[in-house]
Amino acid sequence: MQGWMFGYQRHIWDYETLGALVSRVPNEKMLLLDLAVDYNKHFWHSEVNWEYYKGFYNKQWVYSVIPNMGGKVGMTGVLDFYANGHLEALASANRGNLVAHGLAPEGIENNEVLYELVTDAGWSNRHIDVREWLRQYSMNRYGAAPEQLMTAWDYLMKSVYGSFTDHPRFNWQLRPGSVKNGSINMNADYFRGLESFIAASDKLKDSPYFLTDLCEMTAHYLGGKAELLTKLIDQEYLLGDTLKARFLQSRFETLMLGMDRILSWHPTLRLDRWLSFAKKSARTDAQRKQYEINARRIVTVWGPPVDDYAARIWSGLIGNYYLGRWKEYYRGRESGEPVNLAEWERRWVEENHDSYRWNTDFDIVSFAKEMLALSKDISTAQLLLNRPNMVGTWSLGSGKAKEFEYHIPARMLTNMKGITLEGLKGNGMLECSGLMLVADGIAVVSSSEVISSKNGKLYCKMIVPNGVNANNGCVLTLKLKSKDGNVAGVIACDM
């Protein structure tokens, strides 16, 4: 029996209800999979299941983690936990009938270092020194572990590999205009670590596995810088500087195409490879067409209601799908005309037949350094409109009404008390109505109240029911109306 529900739905499953479900089954006839110990520890922040359920009524059980949802390529995961978390279960008085150690990712071909660590840890009943393990891993994978490489690992363990993110995605992997911040832990150490990894290429340029990882790490670096650019572009549109916004858009396009090009050299992180698998499985032309459409859909829109779930960082997908969708969005920002991104996505999935191959006859190390130099100056220091827990921006013409949609990080739901809209441009009155919060496709908060702004701010109170986790996404929708004058501002969650 898969045990996701035991951590995810504690408001339903307690010790007694689990007993009602499993106690009559002979112990040797049942195997429980404690599916997501990492979620218990680092996302739900709840007591681990073997303690909470007191050894699962002595049923056989497997210690398991889910390092990945949907095959996302973004980096995340507390390496020390994946190396040593199982030791807590082995030492527990409630270990019960623990029989195995495993992992259950929804997708692989991502976060290779994490999978190597988890599978190695399964053979150990002793504490693993993760830094020493990383040194040995680097020696085995690249043939050497120079100082710059170890410095890179140190920094990454203070960012993406020292934190756990549910559904790690850059904001440009989600529909434009619906999300302000991605969910990847892009602190200063993230960029320092990736810069150090790229610098290690001077000593590791002859290692084929290092060059493969260099492609991916460079893409992660550029992906973070591209996210910052989307925020800067949005800021300039909000402040009315369309010339600067267009200049930044050209930089954004350069970085996206840079990611796309360098990953074309990677053996697995490519859309053409994925589509080739699908088409080769077909026996007829009709099947081939349908399989290709299905393959496109699952790595892009996926849903609804779960959209952009797979979030692959792949050559062909970045330059053609993600960049294409943002260019369509910016076309609407420049012209002031509405764009139908859902229709654009449908056409890309069902009608697109573009080629996704670059000429790969180029020097990987030189190109990685070139792209680093082009993007290193982009930083959060250039963001003037940052607010705590900010989730997006809004702008309206005089007397206009418009519906807005914002992705809300699931981690905010537990303490979320409401939202605040702050006007930064214009002095017109703002009205908010039709507020709705949808978690996992279900409306959990809905209000028909019409609220007006006071002194440039508008506050909407929200009561999020207990037990709402929104593992597959949380979206806030609302309708705003400008009573008089052009207005623009930001929206933030109140915690």
Predicted regions, residues:
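Catalytic-core regions of glycoside hydrolase
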Residues: 1-151, 157, 176-185, 191, ...
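Histidine-centered catalytic/metal-binding microenvironments
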Residues: 177-385
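Extracellular carbohydrate recognition and processing domains
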Residues: 385-413, 447-463
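Noncatalytic modules at the cell exterior or secretory-pathway interfaces
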Residues: 410-422, 468-477
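Short beta-strand-plus-loop segments that form exposed binding edges in beta-rich domains
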Residues: 421-428, 479-484
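Beta-strand acidic-aromatic groove motif in beta-rich domains, primarily in extracellular
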Residues: 430-431, 485-493
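Extracellular beta-strand elements of beta-rich domains used
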Residues: 435-437, 442
